[in-house]
Curated annotation (Swiss-Prot):
Mn(2+) 2 binds at residues 426, 489, 523, 537. Its cofactor is Mn(2+). The modification N6-acetyllysine is found at residue 304. It catalyses: Release of any N-terminal amino acid, including proline, that is linked to proline, even from a dipeptide or tripeptide. This is Xaa-Pro aminopeptidase 1. It comes from Mus musculus.
Length: 623
């Protein structure tokens, strides 16, 4: 696939950086982050500014353009993809490698003295702004807000912002009403003497009001802001979508509710003016809560003396701890998902030897089987369907130019998931339809040992996710191997497939302790550039663990796998497993057989059931 030609776009952007219509004084550098005004990871087409300018469309990356340079920072998931998608105008900055400068240090090294660095304040997170501004200031430069987004000025066919209908969720799915959620939030606000809370993250707003949307592909969210006071609720949302009868009834808009639960509906774009007006009337002691990941524009609308920033909002933390209705829904969703994947893998085993299955047709088939399941809404992210060398591109998405045919000679990796009304799934399986090489089996077995080490871990209550990351890497490290991504991320309940504040990563940002009810992924991998990729991913639920003793009465936790899809034993060097690891695998496969087998039977999917039974035969080491 040829990289995007960007010379003319960069020329126009540099011209805009000097245009007095957009900037009071010329700027010498312009920063283009990945996100939108809500700092979302996955964004609508109208917000894909970095991809438009550079050609690189991965979910994480920051572009910086100066008069002479164009540089792109991204992480290890996207090194190969970014290198292929960008032309030679761009320098790829590989984050996490010791020779790669930070964005701030690079700017200081290339900018002329006293430079002005511009950025759209609605898109830049507050914590990023503070860090960048401090370094630039100490080097004699200035970070300046540019209120007109310069990319929008040169993007002549920029798509419209979506404004799609809303979906209401009942108590069967949510377990708790939106009024109760607001009441719980207000209790937390009162504990901290907070008068107002500004909600900017789209998944937090969707969760708070038990609403879902489809404004962002694969993410059931809708463009909005919310402000919650101790006696007031404001929802900033465009279109007439709250006027739909079901939504009106759900939000109780027609009822003469007591004032504290009456929702004022306001235009989406009025958030800054309304927030400034609200802050103008604050008494000296009143505080306004906002995430430090909210945009700089939103934070700056709140006077410093009244602003109370936090890394994780109370909604973010409450949303991460699933209640019993949400946990049960996630279990149901994963059983349905397993049925679809059993169908897929049975189909692949029959069709791949015939030579007509491609990465794209396999991904399409996975979606076809998922669509047959009850309450299917959408995929949860674009399917990563990759064979042979494409598997080494961690977040690869097949397109016609790169679409390989699955064969009996290559490792196949599929990372896929779905949004069902009762839950969100994310699962990766790696398989071989012929005979894997000894080296492929060796690497797969190291990854499996890491996967089991995390899944079977028992750890004290209060443990933070980053402390478990080395469990997943230990077998790889022993052989001098590793992978350049985190081991796990939080998963929403019919919400975003990636959510905070919990995760399992070598980066210590996974700083919220794991607690019962949180749902994360367990997904170690290994990638051999130009050859193959291996990843084994389950979604797991944090649950209390039964232990012989209970030190200091603190309790212990472990994981319950929600994903119930067989792990291909053909890829395993069984003799390299310990007895304990064999026991874990056999127990896991027995659960897959019992739980998913029952559902396959009830849906009359006999061939897939036979495949499941074959794939869950016990394994044993040769002693």
């Amino acid at each position: 696939m040829a990289p995007k030609v960007t010379s003319e776009l960069l020329r126009q952007l540099r011209q805009a950086m000097r245009n007095s219509e957009y900037v009071a004084e010329p700027i010498q550098a312009y920063i283009i982050p990945s996100g939108d005004a809500h700092q979302s990871e996955y964004i609508a087409p109208c917000d894909c500014r970095r991809a438009f300018v550079s050609g690189f469309d991965g979910s994480a990356g920051t572009a910086i353009i100066t008069e002479e340079h164009a540089a792109m920072w991204t992480d290890g998931r996207y090194f190969l993809q970014a290198a292929k998608q960008m032309d030679n105008n761009w320098t790829l900055m590989k984050m996490g490698l010791k020779d790669t400068p930070t964005q701030e240090d690079w700017l200081v090294s290339v900018l002329p003295e006293g430079s002005r660095v511009g950025v759209d304040p609605l898109i830049i997170p507050t914590d990023y702004w503070k860090k960048m501004a401090k370094v630039l200031r100490s080097a004699g430069h200035h970070l300046v807000p540019v209120k007109e987004n310069l990319v929008d000025k040169i993007w002549t066919d920029r798509p419209e912002r979506p404004c799609k209908p809303l979906l209401t969720l009942g108590l069967d799915y949510t377990g708790i009403s939106w009024k109760e959620k607001v009441a719980d939030l207000r209790l937390k606000m009162a504990e901290r003497s907070i008068a107002w809370f500004v909600v900017t993250a789209l998944d937090e707003i969707a969760w708070l009001f038990n609403l879902r949307g489809s404004d962002v592909e694969h993410n059931p969210v809708f463009f909005s802001y919310a402000i919650v006071g101790l006696e007031t609720i404001m929802l900033f949302i465009d279109g007439d979508r709250v006027d739909a009868p079901g939504v009106k009834q759900h939000l109780l808009l027609d009822l003469g509710l007591e004032a504290e639960y009456r929702i004022q509906v306001l235009p989406y774009k009025s958030i800054l003016s309304e927030l400034k007006a609200l802050c103008a009337d604050l008494s000296p002691r009143e505080k306004v809560w906002v995430s430090d990941k909210a945009s700089y524009a939103v934070s700056e609308a709140i006077p410093k003396d009244h602003r109370c920033c936090m890394p994780y909002t109370p909604i973010c933390i409450a949303k991460a701890v699933k209640n019993s209705a949400e946990s049960d829904g996630m279990r149901r969703a994963h059983i349905k998902d397993a049925v679809a994947l059993c169908e897929l893998f049975n189909w692949l085993e029959q069709e791949v030897p015939k030579g007509g299955v491609t990465e794209i047709s396999a991904a399409d088939k996975a979606e076809e089987f998922r669509r047959q399941q009850a309450d299917f809404v959408d995929l949860s992210f674009p399917t990563i369907s990759s064979t042979g060398p494409n598997g080494a591109i961690i977040h690869y998405a097949p397109v016609p130019e790169t679409n390989r045919t699955l064969s009996l000679d290559e490792v196949y990796l599929i990372d896929s998931g779905a949004q069902y009304k009762d839950g969100t799934t994310d699962v990766t399986r790696t398989m071989h339809f012929g005979t894997p090489t000894a080296y492929e089996k060796e690497c797969f077995t190291y990854v499996l040992k890491g996967h089991i080490a995390v899944s079977a871990a028992v750890f004290p209550t209060g443990t933070k996710g980053h402390l478990l990351d080395s469990f997943a890497r230990s077998a790889l490290w022993d052989s001098g191997l590793d992978y350049l991504h985190g081991t796990g991320h939080g998963v929403g309940s019919f919400l975003n497939v990636h959510e905070g504040p919990c995760g399992i990563s070598y980066k210590t940002f996974s700083d919220e302790p794991l607690e019962a009810g949180m749902i994360v992924t367990d997904e170690p991998g290994y990638y051999e550039d130009g050859a193959f990729g291996i990843r084994i991913e389950n979604v797991v639920l944090v649950v209390p663990a039964k232990t012989k003793y209970n030190f200091n009465n603190r309790g212990s936790l472990t994981f319950e796998p929600l994903t119930l899809v067989p792990i291909q034993t053909k890829m395993i060097d069984v003799n390299a497993l310990t007895d304990k690891e064999c026991d874990w695998l056999n127990s896991y496969h027995q659960t897959c057989r019992d739980v998913v087998g029952k559902e396959l039977q009830s849906q009359g999917r006999q061939e897939a059931l036979e495949w499941l039974i074959r794939e869950t035969e016990p394994v044993s080491r040769q002693h």
